[in-house]
Each structure stands twice: as structure tokens, then as C-alpha cells.
């Protein structure tokens, strides 16, 4: 049974999304909600993120909204190190702080500020060790930062019975097309 999922993927700028009110964000959040509801029906209790802008913070917003219907669902934010948002602009820092304030658990793997790239790798390993599955929104046709995690994930799965759901742009496009079609049908 899946009790804990780690959700990660592209940062917003890697998808060329620079505003939270972009239509793509709405579709991505609906897709994430769809995936999480499937897991909730199977017994999901915790959603973990590292607190990165993009897929992770959008996931956090979805989880916080789902808590109205699923009050036992919990959000955990496990950052690589202290101060990971210090270089973000004020608006993004405020968004993160609002989400963190409403999360059920917030901590850092390293209880220090940034020391080096090893912190990201060890945090990824921590997330794999403390979750039952990963929902990774990543398509090899558009390489970006998640490619390093994906390789670690594949290696980890070969050594364990860990599972994952790697979502490609084709799956996202199909979901969006179905969603748009159903919305059009409801207006007729």
C-alpha cells in the first residue's frame, strides 16, 4: 500500500511558465489533483516535496486544497538546506512561506545553509528512502534539472521494489485534451 508519495518535476522556468495565473498552471494542478486522488483512494497519507518552485509548489497548493475533502492528507516539505528560498524574489518567498505555514511537517535534511551540490543528491536519496513511490513529471524530450533525479530513481528501483509514475508530455497532453473535451461537452 502506498502511504507516502514524493512529487517532483520541472521548475516553473523550465516549462517557460513565469506567472501562477498562466493557463498551463491550472491544467498541471488539475492533473496533479487527478493523480493524487487516485493515490488517496488507495490509502495515501503523505505527500512530500522539497519546496521547489514549479511542480512541487503547485503540488503543495493542490494538497492544501484537497485537505478540505481529505482532512487526513498531510503535506511534508523537506528542503535540502536552510535558506533555500533566500535568493527568490519576495513574491515567491511569500508564496513558499504561506505554503510552509500550512504544511504538516517542514524540515531540512541539512541543518545548515548551502554547502554544495552534494546536498541536493543526498536530499533526493532521503526522499526515495522515506517514500513509497514517486510521481515525477518529466519528459526526456525536454531535458532539464529532473534528469539527474530520474537517473537516481531508475537506479534505486533496480535495487529495490520501489515504484514510480513518470509522467511525460504525451500523458499530460492527453489529460488536457480529455479535460477540454469534457468541459466543452458540459456547455452543450
From Swiss-Prot:
The protein's name: UPF0398 protein SSP1297
Gene3D superfamilies documented for this protein: 3.40.50.450
Pfam families: YpsA
Lineage: Bacteria, Bacillati, Bacillota, Bacilli, Bacillales
Annotated family: Belongs to the UPF0398 family.
UniProt-listed SUPFAM superfamilies: MCP/YpsA-like (SSF102405)
Amino acid at each position: 500500500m502506498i502511504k507516502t508519495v514524493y512529487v517532483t518535476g520541472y521548475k516553473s522556468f523550465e516549462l517557460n511558465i513565469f506567472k501562477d495565473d498562466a493557463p498551463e498552471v491550472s491544467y498541471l494542478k488539475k492533473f496533479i489533483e487527478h493523480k493524487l486522488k487516485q493515490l488517496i483512494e488507495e490509502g495515501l497519507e503523505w505527500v512530500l516535496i522539497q519546496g521547489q518552485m514549479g511542480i512541487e509548489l503547485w503540488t503543495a497548493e493542490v494538497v492544501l486544497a484537497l485537505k478540505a475533502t481529505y482532512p487526513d492528507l498531510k503535506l511534508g516539505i523537506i528542503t535540502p538546506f536552510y535558506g533555500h528560498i533566500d535568493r527568490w524574489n519576495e513574491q515567491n518567498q511569500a508564496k513558499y512561506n504561506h505554503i510552509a505555514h500550512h504544511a504538516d511537517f517542514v524540515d531540512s535534511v541539512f541543518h545548515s545553509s548551502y554547502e554544495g551540490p552534494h546536498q541536493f543528491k543526498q536530499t533526493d536519496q532521503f526522499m526515495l528512502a522515506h517514500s513509497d513511490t514517486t510521481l515525477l513529471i518529466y519528459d526526456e524530450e525536454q531535458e532539464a534539472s529532473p534528469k539527474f533525479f530520474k537517473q537516481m530513481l531508475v537506479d534505486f528501483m533496480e535495487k529495490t521494489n520501489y515504484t514510480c509514475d513518470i509522467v511525460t508530455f504525451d500523458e499530460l497532453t492527453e489529460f488536457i485534451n480529455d479535460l477540454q473535451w469534457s468541459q466543452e461537452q458540459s456547455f452543450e
